[in-house]
Amino acid sequence: MTPDLPERLGLRERKKLRAMQQIQWAALDLFDQHGYDAVTIERIAAAAEVSPSSVYRYFGTKERLILHDEYDPALLREMEIELDEHDFMTAVRRALASTMQTLVQGDHEFNQRRMRYVVHEPAVRARMQQDMDEMNAVIAEMLARHTGHDPADLEIRVAVGALVSSFVAAVYYWVDHPELALSDVVEQTLDLIEQGFDLRSI
C-alpha cells in the first residue's frame, strides 16, 4: 500500500512519485526486518523490482529513501505566496494548513514509519539536520526578502530558528505519540511559539 498522491499533480509526475513511494515501502519493510545498516541499495532495488540505478537516480542515498517527500517544497512554495499578504506567523499557519491537508490525506502509517527512522537512526537524523539547516537558510532569505531585513539579522535568525526547531520537536513528539494527529501537534506547537511562555515555569 502506498500513500495517496495529490490530485493536482500531472499524470507523469504522479507515476514517478508512485514508483518512488513503492521503493520507499520496500525499503522500510527491509529496514524493519533486517535493520537499517544491514540493507543495501541493491537489496532494496531487488525487493522493489527496479534497477539499483533507478533507486540512485530517484533518491541518491539510503538516507534519502527515508527523508524524501513532497511536503517541504510545497510548504516553501505556499509560504512564498502567503508572505506577499501576511505577517510571518500568519503566513506560516496558512501555508502549513494547506500543506498539512495533503499530508493528512496521505498514509499515516507510511509517515510514522519514516519518521521513526528519522528519530532513531543516527545517519538519517544527521542528514535530516542538514536538511533543516538548509531550510532555515531558505526561509530566512524568503522572510528577509519580504520584510526588507538582512537574512543575517538577529531577529530573522531567531524567528526562523524558532520555527524550524519547533517543527522538528513537534515531529519527534508525534513519533512518540502516534495516536495524535500531526496537524494537531503542529497547531499546538505554533500556538506555543506565538503566545510565548515563561521558561522559568517549565
What are these regions (language model features)?
Residues 122-147, 154-161:
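Amphipathic alpha-helical packing segments from all-alpha helical-bundle domains
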Residues 1-34, 38-53, 67, 74, ...:
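Basic, helix-initiating cap at the start of DNA-binding domains
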Residues 110, 118, 141, 153-172, ...:
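Hydrophobic alpha-helical segments that form the core
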Residues 77-113:
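Hydrophobic alpha-helical connector segments
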Residues 46, 60-61:
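Residue-level detection of the helix-turn-helix DNA-binding "recognition helix"
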Residues 59, 70:
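DNA major-groove recognition helix of helix-turn-helix
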